[in-house]
UniProtKB/Swiss-Prot annotation:
Gene3D superfamilies: Jelly Rolls
UniProt binding sites for a divalent metal cation: C126, C129, C163, C166
Keywords attached to this entry: Cytoplasm, Dioxygenase, Iron, Metal-binding, Nucleus, Oxidoreductase, Phosphoprotein, Pyridine nucleotide biosynthesis
Protein name, UniProt field: 3-hydroxyanthranilate 3,4-dioxygenase
Cofactor(s) needed by this chain: Fe(2+)
Superkingdom of origin organism: Eukaryota
Presence of keyword Iron: yes
Subunit description: Homodimer.
Biological processes, Gene Ontology terms: 'de novo' NAD biosynthetic process from L-tryptophan; anthranilate metabolic process; L-tryptophan catabolic process; quinolinate biosynthetic process; quinolinate metabolic process
PANTHER family: 3-HYDROXYANTHRANILATE 3,4-DIOXYGENASE (PTHR15497:SF1)
Cellular compartment(s): Cytoplasm; Nucleus
Binding annotation for O2: R45
Length: 177
């Protein structure tokens, strides 16, 4: 039997806000065809997710910043997209993106289940020269845990974090200046 119980988002947030923890801060509400996630802020990550399918963002509380890389030209362009409270945004598939969520913010993200044989990637760009430092490829089976595992793997490996081009040591989490 399929699920017949609606979820009251406001009530769920009051009862479960402790589940939205760094570095990803997400909780999967629904799975099956699509994954519906509640995502809180602040988050602590520098990697860019590359999803082979589109992602839909809805900002329920506060604003967020979606950092994207436009790779349609020979020279990639790093672009910041502000998604304000009440806004929705549909990100096309295969666009590198890094959601920046601020304190006391809440969003909803909907991702389509991946077609067979299509993998997600988590990519880190050098903070100094913007070249690709490391990329992890994974068959996305559990959004609630796999992104976090990729972040921790990068964070714990200095070799993966060191830029081949300029030798800058990069980090999995933003560093205060």
């Amino acid at each position: 039997m399929f699920n017949t119980t609606p979820i009251n988002i406001d009530k769920w947030l009051k009862e479960n806000e402790g589940l939205l923890k760094p570095p990803v801060n997400n909780y999967c509400l629904h799975k099956g065809g699509f994954t519906v996630m509640i995502v809180g802020g602040p988050n602590e990550r520098t990697g860019y997710h590359i999803n082979p399918t589109p992602e839909w963002f809805y900002q329920k509380k506060g604003s967020m910043l979606l950092k994207v890389v436009d790779e349609t030209d020979a020279e990639p362009k790093f672009i910041d997209i502000i998604i304000n409270e009440g806004d929705s945004y549909l990100l096309p598939g295969n666009v590198p993106h890094s959601p920046v969520r601020f304190a006391d913010t809440v969003g909803i993200v909907v991702e389509q289940d991946r077609p067979g044989g299509e993998n997600d990637k988590i990519r880190w760009y050098c903070s100094h020269c913007r070249q690709v430092v490391h990329e992890s490829e994974l068959q996305m089976l559990d959004l609630g845990t796999q992104v976090k595992e990729a972040i921790l793997d990068f964070e714990n490996d200095v070799e993966k974090r060191t830029c081949f081009h300029c030798k800058t040591l990069n980090y999995a989490r933003p560093q205060s200046n």
